[in-house]
A protein has these predicted regions:
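Metabolite-binding pocket within alpha/beta catalytic cores that recognizes anionic/polar moieties
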Residues: 1-150
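Hydrophobic/aromatic beta-strand patches that form the interior of the parallel beta-sheet core
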Residues: 70, 97, 121, 165, ...
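A short alpha/beta connector and helix-capping loop motif
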Residues: 109-126, 205-221, 231
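Active-site rim beta-loop-alpha module in soluble metabolic enzymes
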Residues: 140-191, 196-198
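A C-terminal functional module that forms or caps the active site or interfaces directly
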Residues: 179-226
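His/Asp/Glu-rich mid-to-C-terminal helical/loop segments that flank catalytic regions of hydrolases
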Residues: 224-271
Length: 271
């Protein structure tokens, strides 16, 4: 890779060294507000600007069973995701466990099951369009870490199955047309979000030269059918009128799985 003018070492690294988080090797990355499930765990707030795009109140150290993990929330879009992953690599993080929301495309999951409102999904790989990903990779499809994908499949503890998907990574939430979604379906995609390809690409190629093991799981918050009809729990939730599925609350099941099960398996090197 050609040298670049700024790196985490020359920017945040002027104040914070690689050992800043004292040996923590796992980071949770929330592409949404933190769900209420975090209230189950002791959390220490950080006080400094360790990440250029994240406010200190969005960065916590969460502990369960004596195991601390770094928790980042309100990470949105490609530029923020990629910069944050670059900085995590500088800080010595080895595993990134991401969670968030996505729109369903009205098709079954990769294994054929219905992928409806409130379904849990596991992003096996992501279709890149433009935006941030091409700065890191020329590939059109960017994979998650295959070992982590398998770990999620084997160890998932949620109340409903978690379904494997390909995520289309868009860059403008208010510019998603029927024609665009049809192209995503033709590309083998099951959901659309704003982050998966960027997240995975920066995990594979970054200024630290480190390959972070990264996976993203989430909850379907709205569905656009092939005929263009829209069902959106997210819109109802934002209007403070949700009466059925609350997708943000359901991300708490993913957070619990990451903190209580997957993190321990990774540290204990359980296959």
């Amino acid at each position: 890779m050609a040298p670049f003018h700024l790196t985490p070492q020359t920017l945040v690294g002027r104040r914070f060294g690689p050992d800043t988080f004292d040996g923590i090797r796992i980071a949770l990355m929330g592409f949404c507000p933190p769900p209420a499930a975090f209230g189950r765990y002791p959390r220490d707030r950080t006080r400094d600007q360790h990440f250029i795009h994240l406010a200190p109140e969005s960065v916590r150290i969460v502990t369960h069973g004596g195991l601390p993990v770094l928790s980042l929330s309100h990470v949105y879009g490609g530029p923020v995701a990629s910069a944050t992953v670059e900085e995590l690599a500088w800080y010595g993080i080895e595993h990134v466990l991401a969670y968030g929301l996505a729109g369903g495309l009205g098709v079954g999951a990769a294994t054929g099951e219905t992928l409806g409102m409130g379904a849990f999904y596991l992003v096996q790989d992501a279709l890149a369009r433009d935006g941030t990903t091409p700065h890191y990779s020329e590939a059109s499809v960017i994979p998650a870490d295959p070992g982590l994908v398998e770990q999620v499949r084997v160890a998932w503890t949620g109340p409903d199955p978690i379904l494997p998907v390909r995520a289309a990574t868009n860059d403008a939430i208010y510019r998603e047309s029927d024609a665009m979604l049809d192209r995503f379906r033709a590309g083998g995609c099951h959901v659309v979000n704003l982050d998966s390809a960027h997240l995975y690409a920066a995990s594979l190629v970054n200024s630290a030269g480190r390959r972070l093991r990264t996976v993203q799981c989430g909850v379907v918050s709205d569905v656009v059918e092939r005929d263009g009809s829209l069902l959106s729990a997210l819109a109802e939730m934002l209007a403070k009128g949700a009466t059925g599925v609350n997708p943000l609350d359901k991300t708490g099941e993913i957070v619990r799985f990451y903190i209580e099960t997957l993190s321990r398996r990774l540290i204990d090197k359980i296959p």
